[in-house]
Amino acid sequence: MASFDFIDEVKKYVQAGHGGPGVVHFRREKFVPKGGPDGGDGGKGGDIILKGNKQLSTLLHLKYRKHIVAEDGKSGEGGCRTGADGTSIILEVPLGTVAKDIDSGNILVDITEDGQQTILLHGGRGGQGNVHFKTPTQQAPRHAQPGESGEEGWIKLELKLLAEVGLVGFPNAGKSTLLASISAAKPKIANYPFTTLVPQLGVVAYREGHSFVLADMPGIIEGASMGKGLGTRFLKHIERNRVLVLMISADDTANIVQTYTSLLKELKSYSEDLFKKPRILVISKLDLIGAEEKVTIKKLLPKQIDCVFISSVTGEGLQKFKDKIWKLLHPELK
């Protein structure tokens, strides 16, 4: 997917339909000179509904859509007939989409399942017709209720990708090559920074028919948690990940510890919850270093760090990597 096609945030003014007005009406029947009130109620205004669609992967289809307004309910009619309800608007969104109130920042809806439908804004109720206002002392009421206003406001739709495992690292750490080597995903791979401009997802096959979803995030830079580079736009996508993979290239032996510390700093600065997620350190591009450099790296890293060395080119360490990920995803199997 081209970067200009991947839209993960849109802001929209949305308005549910207003309820239709109740009507003032009296029976007109032959041989009944004083027919009573029979004004019907107004119809309900249409709702604004979000619906999950697993075939979608971006909010691009909503980016250029103008104000979204549902249909108003119709007026009540004589004969105690209720007006027609307004047609609701169903907005299909990718799984992982949340709707937030722009003013408060509160999450209104969280779409995580295919076919899930949740009302974002409710349409107004229809007003009551004059049939409801007849009393012993008022046999011919000449008033009815207007319909209620539908809910409205500015909202932000925000896509947070659904993947169990997230690859996090600085540019050229080998994340895209790893994703391509263990899944059917075809990310763009090149020897220059920021080749990956949008998140890429791949399904990784595991033992006995099991699998997990791995997400390759664009490379971050120091200060990403403060918005530098691609910044928080893509850090937010790993909020749903259950396990984080911190990747560092083996050909930068001298700076391994500093790079690892910098990655942790960015995670913690963005969110304490991200920092607390289960994680594993992966040293990639093992094929570019010798046995002595591997030993040196092991000595440099604190012993408590769970680390695995891999080469996406030769395949060395990839099964061990998948085994470790599976254990982190399923701690109950230990």
From Swiss-Prot:
- Keyword Isomerase appears in the UniProt entry: no
| Signal peptide interval | none
Query: Which GO terms fall under biological process for this protein?
Result: ribosome biogenesis
GO MF term set: GTP binding; GTPase activity; magnesium ion binding
Sites where the protein binds GTP: 169-176, 194-198, 216-219, 284-287, 311-313
Q: Name one GO cellular component term.
A: cytoplasm
User: Which keywords describe this protein according to UniProt?
Assistant: Cytoplasm, GTP-binding, Hydrolase, Magnesium, Metal-binding, Nucleotide-binding
- Cofactors, names only: Mg(2+)
Q: Does Metal-binding show up as a keyword for this record?
A: yes
* CDD domains reported for this sequence: Obg
Q: Which parts of the sequence belong to the OBG-type G domain?
A: 163-330
* Subunit relationships: Monomer.
What family does the Swiss-Prot or TrEMBL record give for this protein? Belongs to the TRAFAC class OBG-HflX-like GTPase superfamily. OBG GTPase family.
Q: What does this protein do?
A: An essential GTPase which binds GTP, GDP and possibly (p)ppGpp with moderate affinity, with high nucleotide exchange rates and a fairly low GTP hydrolysis rate. Plays a role in control of the cell cycle, stress response, ribosome biogenesis and in those bacteria that undergo differentiation, in morphogenesis control.
Its name, as the record gives it, is: GTPase Obg
